[in-house]
Structures are given as structure tokens and as C-alpha cells.
Amino acid sequence: MARPLRAPLRRSFSDHIRDSTARALDVIWKNTRDRRLAEIEAKEACDWLRAAGFPQYAQLYEDLLFPIDISSVKREHDFLDRDAIEALCRRLNTLNKCAVMKLEISPHRKRSEDSDEDEPCAISGKWTFQRDSKRWSRLEEFDVFSPKQDPIPGSPDAVHLKSAPSHENMQTDLSDRQEVASVHSTGSLTTHAPQRGEAAPARTNSVLSVCSSGTFVGNDDSFCSLPSPKELSSFSFSMKGHEKAAKSKTHSLLKRMESLKLKGSHHSKHKAPSKLGLIISGPILQEGVDEEKLKQLNCVEISALNGNHINVPMVRKRSISSSTQTSSSSSQSETSSNVSTPSPVTRTRSLSACNKRGGMYLEGFDPFNQSTFNNVMEQNCKNRESYPEDTVFYIPEDHKPGTFPKALSNGSFSPSGNNSSVNWRTGSFHGPGHISLRRENSSPKELKRRNSSSSVSSRLSIYDNVPGSILYSSSGDLADLENEDIFPELDDILYHVKGMQRIVNQWSEKFSDEGDSDSALDSVSPCPSSPKQIHLDVDNDRATPSDLDSTGNSLNEPEEPSDIPERRDSGVGASLTRSNRHRLRWHSFQSSHRPSLNSVSLQINCQSVAQMNLLQKYSLLKLTALLEKYTPSNKHGFSWAVPKFMKRIKVPDYKDRNVFGVPLTVNVQRTGQPLPQSIQQAMRYLRNHCLDQVGLFRKSGVKSRIQALRQMNESTIDCVNYEGQSAYDVADMLKQYFRDLPEPLMTNKLSETFLQIYQYVPKDQRLQAIKAAIMLLPDENREVLQTLLYFLSDVTAAVKENQMTPTNLAVCLAPSLFHLNTLKRENSSPRVMQRKQSLGKPDQKDLNENLAATQGLAHMIAECKKLFQVPEEMSRCRNSYTEQELKPLTLEALGRLCNDDSADYQHFLQDCVDSLFKEVKEKFKGWVSYSTSEQAELSYKKVSEGPPLRLWRATIEVPATPEEILKRLLKEQHLWDVDLLDSKVIEILDSQTEIYQYVQNSMAPHPARDYVVLRTWRTNLPKGACALLLTSVDHDRAPVVGVRVNVLLARYLIEPCGSGKSKLTYMCRADLRGHMPEWYTKSFGHLCAAEVVKIRDSFSHQNTETKDTKSR
């Protein structure tokens, strides 16, 4: 008998339980870790999507509407390049993966009430933000000129609806499924069409959207009529697609849908009802349509047109009309902004090509209209006849032989006749009918306005390379460009004599008695050069005077006078913004770096706040795409985000510091400019007198003298006299200023990014990468960087004398600008620093970073003119970018803002007065107090309409009566506005209303700020109060002198409070151009408070002088 087999030896039950429990815990821990990491990635991906201009996808994920179809996202952003698309899709794929894992993140919330980071801004123009519901909704559009072949009518493909991005997205809102339908034509760009009977709503709103090509919902006239029933037969309305798709889902998916339903019902409680309603577009062209339908659709038979015409898809017919409006942009969006001038502005260029309004704008140009070409040809013929080729040119009597004349005349012009005047030194001509921009208290020596009309014989050329002559005559008047033209033949003349430009400029500077005046009101040419100024510009393939090297302008200018009025305040803290502050006038620096006409609209300092917001998001997208493509995997991740400027951290007290160690933001809040005046004067001294010093910024100065200069800057911040100082001492002091800043000029957050660009990004990609990184800098850092780079480019222009190339300068200045040693000490542990010190030599990483900093600064100095321009790629997203350029309205357009059709601008002004007193009656309810170092009360109020700008209010007590304060505001602006360059009343509308233009100075080389406002005042108010109201307006008689500012709202309310004192309340909401929304949040309120303080101090200073006079 065989023995039975023995069972194998088994472990004890306790060991088995222990091992299985350990394995289960490992699995649970791994799943928990993976889930936590996925949640972190999802949160950072949503933050990046909002910062890079894709907030709609972050909203969809938070609403549990993921996963989405990546291919539809690519089609929606077809204007982006491949790298940017990959960066976007990488985040969306991460969210799709997290959605499959059923991960949820908390809804996005602001960190604080001071932050305006949630301002809606999307790169794509196919999404719109509903301000009432705080939701993003998609504007579904057709492409009538689809490259795909249309299906045969009646075929199954002809009635298919657009497929949903995913099956889960089909069940967006079960409670509202009976109201959602999306109707598309056969010409829609749809690549993933579902089978017949499947419905795919792509919107979360309960609306029926049928959009036509190239239009936005509610912005086009094509939506005013409904299609006929026969036309509607080509569309399929399927309301039960949700139910059919839901039946095919598994049990788990049904549970998910139930959670969506609960979430949707939860959101509906906080969600405002949609106001879009039923919107149906015009009929969509399809195959087999008859002649009757074509007439009904107002279609144009393209095949019957002339062969010379160009078939351009999505071109809407617009009438070509001439206008005298000025514009800061060289092109306009096809979709006009709601607040822009109602009629399309079309400007044509004549053969002269030199007139101020002679730019060629193709907006509204209809390529299918043959009469357009006939009109243009006829106008060209008239231009040729008006400028005969045998025109005789005259030169002035005091012309110096061997130099090019600064003024030329033709015909029978006589310099001493026709009641005209010629400024031979500046090249400007004041003919009959000249309008001058002159302050109210102008001297009688200035020219009077003439009433006769100008003729062709009075036309002269105005040169942009003559220092000191902007649009002003020798008497300080502003030229009337609308009544003056420039000879077209001068283009050809300049083409042959462009080599003599430098000689002319040096000669003019030598004999010029104008120089840089410290007072704009006493200056012959008070307004600095601006990119909007008209100047002589030759053809695109020729060199322009503004594009010449900076050495083409004279660098020798007289020093600022040192006789500064004695200060009567402490000179620190809030007293830093007193009305007797001295401001630097640096005209030659501004004129030498003035952009050419064809690049004016691309300058960053000309963009509106909404455009800057969109440009910053696009820059983050571009920078992320480049760094993720070229840097190592451990050098990037989801940590890319826009720098957060409103962190809740304890801000150090800088009351005991004035210059060194003070952040740039504090300088802006104190003085309105990011660089202290004494530092600007040091740069001017080096530029005017020390560029010939060999080894400038390389040779060291004397420490004792440098310390004395530092103390001089701290004690006298308004005006430091550097006369007789050593160039090397001043240069070393300038390096120490940037070294002592609390953070590097490129900021702590972005300094490493700048270094990575020059370590990993290829050379041909570095320019666009560095431009994107610069756009992520705070405004004050970017402005100072631009000023410094332009200054250093002037230093390198004199390389033959000082032997300082861009690389040599970079070696000397890179450690101070990047704070390389400081960053290493802060980012390294004490053990690592001790090991490096013991070795006695830097490691390879430090060497690479130093080399990258040197190469980067040298590259930025050489390419400084290209770094501060809008990228050309922004033109691809034209509809979403150009429509953000909010321009001032005309008087007629202001009247149309009222609900009454017969209203004019007077009704608009009366509404403004009523709204002001409504605020006073409600005691400014809803305003939030804001701390400031100024001796004034500051508060703000958020406004939902218009650009992302707050309404600020500053209140102070002034020792004067309301009538005196109103007079000071209207007639004596130069007594309290230290930045004022010139002012002029353009037109008097009535006894209390006028069009007023004034120009304010900016930190060189940035252009001046040009204001054209409609202002009205009231004196017969209750309790003896007075009010002054201002709003920017577009006026054809106001020439553009600088960057045109858009004042949305400005109000002065003056209330008596007894004892000869008054309470001044100033409210302002303005777009100064070239600033991000964060700048207005951080700094603009302080500037408003500083303004009322300067108004008060103008009376205090006057009373003090009166008492001193009486005591004598």
C-alpha cells in the first residue's frame, strides 16, 4: 500500500495576513501618491492655462466637462505655431488623464481682493466671456469658404451635426438637455463627424447657436433676419441625442453623469441667466441653390468678376471713406471694437508718401469693387498734376554752403511775404492759418493765429533729425499738420544726401541755443520727440533718419541749471512728490531712439491695457513652448506662471532711503518714474561728456569719491551736479545702484529664465524667447531695462573712442544686473557654499551661468531696438488682439452712448454730472480704502465694464476756496504738474465746455503722453461746490504729439469746508498705454494721491512766499 503524499509546508496564517496586508498597503500608498501627484499636475495645468490665455479650458475641467478632443483645440488655435500648440496640448492631455481618473480640483479663487488676476482674457477670438455669469462660452462659427468639398445635398453627410469632443462632453448638463442644440452647415470645418442620429452640443449655455463665418455673435448685421423655412430644411435639429447616448453608457458613466447633474444644479443657483437667447445667422451658401435664394442672401457671384480681383475669404464689404482721425496703430481689426469710432477709417497714401495721414490702410478695402480701383487711379492722377516735376526749390538766405538745407520751398515762395514765418534752424514753416499749441499765459511775442488759407507754395519739409524741433515753431507753437504738406520730391533728395545727415545734425547742435531746458513752459521746444510725430520717412527699402545709428545725433547738450528752488519740506516720505520737484528734460536721448513710422504701432508703449494683458499671456505661451522644447526635462515643468506681484508679504519700510536700495515700484509710487532723477542725471552726464573715456564701466573709480557721490544722491535726489566728477566714479556709482536693488533688474523669478534662454535655446530662437521673457517683467523693470539698454547702445556707438563693445560692457555690468553672486548665496545651502569656498574655484554651473549672463546682456544691447516691439505672431490672432485697442470716441459717438437717439455730447456730460452727485449722495458707498504714503485719503472701486481698470479716488483738504482751486485746475496747470510740457485749448464749445490738449513728459527715452480731453466745469452747484469733468475725445484738429492717452473718466469735486479751505476729491480711470493691469493696481492709485497733494502744495508754497514777502 502506497503512502499518501504529504501536503507542502505552508506558512503560518499570521505571516500570510502580514504579507498580504503589506502588499495591499503598498498598492494603496502607490495609488494615493499617483493620485496626489496627478492632482498637483492638474492644478498647475489649470493655473498655466489661465496665465497663458486659455481660461476656457480650465473652466471646462473644473466643471467636470473633460476629457475634450485635442484635434478640435488645434483647429481652434490654428494661428499658433507648432511649439505653442504642443505646450497647450501637453496640459490638456494631462487634464484628460486626470479626468479619466475622476480627479477634481477646487474652483479657482483669487488670493486676495487686491488681485485682478482673474481678468478674462483668451487668446482665441472664438470664445467670449459672459460678465454677468462669469462664464466662458464658445462662439461657434462656420467657414463658408471651406477648402473641403461640400457633400451632395440629401446625402447622410449633409445633415450630420458636429461631433462632440468626447462622449462624456455630450452629457454636459442633463437638466438643460432639452434646450441645447448646435446647428452647423456642411461647410463647417468638422473632421470627426458622428453617425446619423448622434447629437453633439459643444456649449454649456442653453442657447441655440447658428453662427456664420468670420463674425461674432451679436456684432454683425447678418443676424437681424431669420432664414426661410426652405433654408432651415438643410439643418438638423436633434433634441434627443443626449438620451440615446446616455442609454449606451455603462453603470459607472451614469454615476458620473449624476454627479454632473448635481454639480450643474449647484452652479445654477449662483449663475445668472443667459442673455443671448435664440441667435440665428444669415443663410449659409450650399450647392444647388437657385437664383432666387442667391438674391435673398445678397451673394456676390465671384466667378463673374474680373480676373484681376483676388479671391479673399471672409472679407466683408465696407465703404472706403476718408477721415482725419489719428491712429496709433498701422492697421485695424476687421471686427471693430464696440467703443471705437463707428465708421470704418480708411486712409490712402498719395504719391507724396510724407503727409502725416498718408499711411496706407487696407481695412475696409473691397477687392471685388472695380470702382475702388478707378477712384484710386483718378486720385493718383490728381496728385501727379498737383506736384509738377519742374518745381523750383528755394533755400534760405542764411544757408551754410556745404550742408544740406533745413528748409526748402517751391513755387513763388518768399520768406518775408505772405504773412508767414519760417524757422530755418528747426526746418518748420508757419504759414497762414497756423494753429499753435500754446499755454494760456503765453507771452505776446509768440505768433498769432492767421486767418488766411495756405497754399502749395507754403509747404515745407519738417525733419525728424533736427534736435529740439518737434511740432513746434521757434516760438513754442505746435504746427498745424492738417494745413501743411511735405514735398514728395524730398524723398528722392534725401536718398542721395543721406550720408550728410550726421554733419547737418552736428552743425545744428553747435549753433543751437535751445538745448534741454529745465522748464517745459519756458522751453522753445518743450515737447519731447514721440513716435507719433510726423517726420521725414523715405521708402521701406531705404534708410530712415530715425533708423540711423544713435551717434547721428549730437550728444553734447547743456547741463541742467543748478539753481533749484529751496525745498520747504523734509525731502523724505510723502514729501517726495512736492510741486517744486525738478524733472529731467532729456530731449536728445528721446529723439535719437525715436522709432520709425512703420514701427510705431509695434512699440509696446503704444499698446492699450487690454492688449498688454493679451500680449503677456501670449508671451508666457511662447516662452513655455521654447523652454520645454530645448531645456532639459528637469529645467521646466508646470511651475511656469505669470509673476505674482500682489503677494501678501511684509513690505520693508523705505522711508529712510531715497535712492539706493529702494525698489523700482516704490520710486513709481513716489515720483511717477521708476528711476530716481539723480540716477537719470548720472546717465545723462556720462552720455554727454564721458563717452570718449577709454574703458568706461571697466576701469574702477575711487571708493571714497564713489561714497561721496552716493551720499550726495541720498541727500539731494532732485538735482545732483556731476560737473567735474570723474567718469569712472559716476559709472561705478551707477553699477552700484543696480547692484543694491532689492532684487535683480530681471527679478528673482525670471533671472534664471533669462540665463536658461542663453544656455539652451538656439541662437536663431533667442530673440523671440527674450522678447517673451521681457514681456513677463513688471512694467517698471521693463521700462528701466529699456532705458538702460538704449543708454548702453549709445556707449557702444562710441567704441572707437572708449573701446567698449557690447561684450565688454556685458562683462562689466552682467553681475550687477543679474545679481549672480547674490542669487548663488541665497539659493545654495551653507554646506555647499563652504565647500565652494574651500575649493577656491567656481564649479561648472557657475561658469555656465556667468557666460550666459554675459552673452545675454551683450545680445540685448545689440538688439535693443527689437526687444520692445509687439511680436509679429500677434497679427495671426488679429481678431482677438486688435479689437482690444480701445480708442477715444468722437463727440458724436459720445452722444450715442446715451439711450436717446437724439442725444449729443451735452447729454453725455450731464449724465456724468448726475452720476458724480449720485456718488456724493450715497457717500461713496462700495469704495474700498487703500493705504498710501501720501497725505491723502485713497480708495478704489472695481468697474465691470470696459478694460480691466479700477476707478481710483483721492481726497485731500486744500487751503483755498473752490473758485481758486478750479482756476488752478483750468488755467494754471503748470504750477502743480511738474511733468507738463505744453497745453492748448483746441476748441471752445460753450462757456463751460472745451476741447483741451496737453502733453506730459515721460522718462527718457520713452515718448511723451498726449492728452486730448473734453472738459466741462460747473460752478452753480449746491453749497457752493464746483466740479470739473474730463473725458478723452478724438478730435481732428488735435495733432498727435506723443502716445495718445485714453482718459475714460476724470472728475474733480471741490466742496467748501469753511475757514477758506476746501475738500478736493479726485476720481480717475485712465489707460496711459504700455502698462499691464497689475501696474494700475499697484501704482496708479498712488499717482492719483500724489496729484492732489501737489495741487494742495501749490497753494501752500504760494502762501508761504506771500508771508515771506510781507515780513520783508
UniProtKB/Swiss-Prot annotation:
Region (Polybasic cluster (PBR)): 635-657
UniProt modified residues of type Phosphoserine: 112, 115, 155, 343
Annotated ranges, domain SAM: 37-104
UniProt feature, compositional bias: Low complexity: 320-348, 409-423
Location of the START domain: 898-1105
Biased composition (Basic and acidic residues): 437-446, 534-544
SUPFAM superfamilies named among the record's database cross-references: Bet v1-like, GTPase activation domain, GAP, SAM/Pointed domain
Cysteines paired by S-S bonds: none
BP-aspect Gene Ontology terms: actin cytoskeleton organization; regulation of Rho protein signal transduction; signal transduction
Main localisation: cytoplasm
MF terms (GO), sorted A to Z: GTPase activator activity; lipid binding
Pfam families attached to this UniProt entry: RhoGAP, SAM_2, START
Site entry: Arginine finger: 698
Region (Focal adhesion-targeting (FAT)), start-end ranges: 296-468
Residue ranges, annotated region (Disordered): 146-203, 318-350, 405-459, 512-574
Entry GO terms, CC: cytoplasm; focal adhesion; membrane raft
Record keywords, A-Z: Cell junction, Cytoplasm, GTPase activation, Membrane, Phosphoprotein, Tumor suppressor
Mode of membrane association: Peripheral membrane protein
Composition skew (Polar residues), residue ranges: 183-193, 520-532, 547-556
UniProt KW Membrane keyword: yes
Residue intervals of the Rho-GAP domain: 662-868
Cellular location(s): Cytoplasm; Cell junction, Focal adhesion; Membrane
Function (record text): Functions as a GTPase-activating protein for the small GTPases RHOA, RHOB, RHOC and CDC42, terminating their downstream signaling. This induces morphological changes and detachment through cytoskeletal reorganization, playing a critical role in biological processes such as cell migration and proliferation. Also functions in vivo as an activator of the phospholipase PLCD1. Active DLC1 increases cell migration velocity but reduces directionality.
Subunit structure: Interacts with EF1A1, facilitates EF1A1 distribution to the membrane periphery and ruffles upon growth factor stimulation and suppresses cell migration. Interacts with tensin TNS1 (via N-terminus); the interaction is decreased by phosphorylation of TNS1. Interacts with TNS3 and PTEN; in resting cells, interacts with TNS3 (via C2 tensin-type domain) but, following growth factor stimulation, TNS3 and PTEN are phosphorylated which leads to weakened interaction with TNS3 and enhanced interaction with PTEN.
Domain notes: The SAM domain mediates interaction with EF1A1, and functions as an autoinhibitory regulator of RhoGAP Activity.
Listed name of the protein: Rho GTPase-activating protein 7
Classification lineage: Eukaryota, Metazoa, Chordata, Craniata, Vertebrata
